[in-house]
Amino acid sequence: MSVVIRLARAGTKKRPFYHVVVADSRFPRDGRFIERLGYFNPLMAKDNEARLKLDLDKVKDWLAKGAQPSDRVARFLDTAGIKKREARNNPEKAVPRKERKAAEAGK
């Protein structure tokens, strides 16, 4: 069973609110989950402490058990100082399209 820590959307139309949950990766985004770890309210100001609330002890336990955080949750954990997020690197992104196609044709 592949376990992931991710955001599950709640709230109403045009007023998003997210629960930070632990779920099996095969379950739907807003479907069944194993445990709720906190919440994220994107409508609040970025400097407001109530914008993101996480139970850090539970998060650490799930990470120790092998749960993989989603990209957005990994950002939250990096900000909280729990888990360092690796920078993504795409070296082909900087190469112009014409040069990229020429390099692929030359291979």
Swiss-Prot record:
GO molecular function: structural constituent of ribosome
GO BP terms in the entry: translation
Keywords: Ribonucleoprotein, Ribosomal protein
Paired cysteines (S-S): none
GO (cellular component) term, any one: cytoplasm
Region (Disordered): 85-107
InterPro entries in UniProt: Ribosomal_bS16, Ribosomal_bS16_dom_sf
Annotated HAMAP family: Ribosomal_bS16
Family the entry assigns: Belongs to the bacterial ribosomal protein bS16 family.
Full protein name: Small ribosomal subunit protein bS16
Protein source organism: Rhodopseudomonas palustris (strain BisB5)
